[in-house]
Amino acid sequence: VDIDPAIRGLAEQHFLKDRARGEFIAEDARRFVTDTTRRFDAVVVDVYSARMSIPAHLVTREFWAASRQALKPDGVMLANLILDGRLATPYARNLLATIESVYGRCGIDVLHRGQAVSNVVVVCYSNPAGAPAAVYSDERNRADTDVIRAN
């Protein structure tokens, strides 16, 4: 799915060196995940409106919720984001918090940690495994029990 129909030809010519084998859909990503009735094993979000800018309508809770709805029950969402490599700016913190408000805990890999600009890969599952996580405290510390159960 890409909003620009010319992307298919560019991808086939410069990256694939052959015709794309899958279906290409020229449509806005948000409109697609909102309107589709199909369910996918994976949704990859790799969208930019400029070198370091993601379109505003693709960073909202509503977009991420629609992307999750487009997944099969055991599906995975992978997002390639451009953020600061320290994850310290309000934009980086807020975008990651928005994604995790929909998906729960996600894996986050900063490719150039500490740099002003970095690719940040986020991996989330449509149905995270296990029961809700508990917080260890001095009053209720079950860490040793959890370690034994895990082994």
Locations of regions flagged by a protein language model:
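A generic structural signal for alpha->beta connector loops
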Residues: R19-R21, D74, Y103-R105, D144-D146
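The AdoMet/dcAdoMet-binding core of the Class I SAM-like
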Residues: V1-L78, I82, R86-L96
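Conserved Class I S-adenosyl-L-methionine
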Residues: T89-V110
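Alpha-helical structural signal in soluble globular domains
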Residues: H14, T98-V102, S126
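Soluble small-group transferase modules, centered on the S-adenosyl donor enzyme superfamily
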Residues: R105-N151
